[in-house]
Each structure stands twice: as C-alpha cells, then as structure tokens.
Amino acid sequence: MVQARYDSVAQHYEGVMGPFQRWGLVKLRKETLSQLPPGNILEIGAGTGLNFVHYPQDTRGVATEFSREMLNIAVTKPRPGGVQLLQNRAEDLPFKTHSFDAAFATLVFCSVEHPAAAFAELRRVVRPGGTVVLLEHVRPHGILGPVFDFLNVFSTRLFEDHVNRRTAKMMSEAGLEVVDVKSRLLGIINLIKCRVS
C-alpha cells in the first residue's frame, strides 16, 4: 500500500530528496507556486512540507497529505498562518464543491493510486475558472519513452511510483482544460497548468 510505504520512508525522505533539491528541484518548486493566483489554495500531497518555504506569507488554504508520518514532520515546518494541514487521500477530498481558487501538487501524482478519481476531485473542489498546477515526472517523448516504460515495471513494484504516466493527457481526459505544459529535464519533468471549466 502506498501510504504504508511513505510512512516507512518519512524519516529519510528529505535526506533522499536533498541532492535533487540542490540540482534544480527548489527552482522548479518555486516556479510551480508562481503559477498560482491569489486566493484559497489547496496543496495535494504536501509530504514533509518542502513547499511551505515557497508559499507567499499571505497564503490561505489547506495542505493535505495521506501519510501520517510525513504529516507529523510537515506540522513542525514553518508555514503561513492561514494554511491548515489535513491527512487525506487525493481521491476523496472532504471539501465542498468549488471551495478553492487553485490547487497544486509537486511530484505526487506518480504515486496516486487512482489518478482519474483524484483529478475529478480537483475539478470538483476548485471553482470554475480556477487553476490546477502540477509538477510531475512523466513519460518523456522520443527515445526515452520506451526506456521509461521499461523502468516503470521496476519502479511500480519497488516504490509504487509510476514513471511513465502521461499526466497532461490524463488531466484532459478528466475534464481539466490543459492550458500550458512546460517540459524540463529532457521531458522527464512537466509543469502542467490547467483551467477548471
């Protein structure tokens, strides 16, 4: 189960992510948050709170995380006073329809068990005209695509991490209007911006 795996690695997560943070992930996190409009914001998969440092100080909203152990670390991190933390799965959000002006996630949907259900929930809880932004590693185009298809056999078994998802296509199929896709790192990372209609 994905939740149990993240509970088991929570204490080591930031150590593992450290090199990636230094090699450009910090910049990508900042770029992701820069795409968000002001208003009531939802973060899906806040993890240990690595994005909190990039939140504008006047941010208000909710940061969700399904791993209790990750959330126990996140709660110790400084964050804007208007941001609440909540343990929850992306596929079953406990919010009223049109509760948020925007939602975002960074490197989360590769591990979401039922992404179509989670995208449907984002479409429901973000108001019409609102924004959904994802920073995700995805199946790259070209010669790397089949390589990632092969790697996916092992990454899903070992880490429950899907490295070959076509995330922008899945978002579109769920009814989100994809307005921009920025490709990074040979297409392995995508910054995807959607509008809720």
What does each of the following model-derived ranges do?
Residues A102-H114:
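A short SAM/SAH-binding and catalytic strip from SAM-dependent methyltransferases
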Residues E91-A103:
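A short acidic, Gly/Pro-enriched loop at the edge of an enzyme's catalytic core
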Residues M17-Q21, V133-L191:
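C-terminal alpha-helical "lid/dimerization" subdomain adjacent to the S-adenosyl-L-methionine
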Residues L191-S197:
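C-terminal lobe and adjacent flexible extensions of AdoMet/dcAdoMet transferase-like proteins
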Residues A116-T131:
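A short glycine-rich, Lys/Arg-flanked "PGG" loop and its adjoining helix->strand segment in the class I
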Residues M1-P37, L50-N51, M70-I73, V147-F154, ...:
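Conserved class I S-adenosyl-L-methionine
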Residues N40-D92:
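Class I SAM-dependent methyltransferase SAM/SAH-binding core
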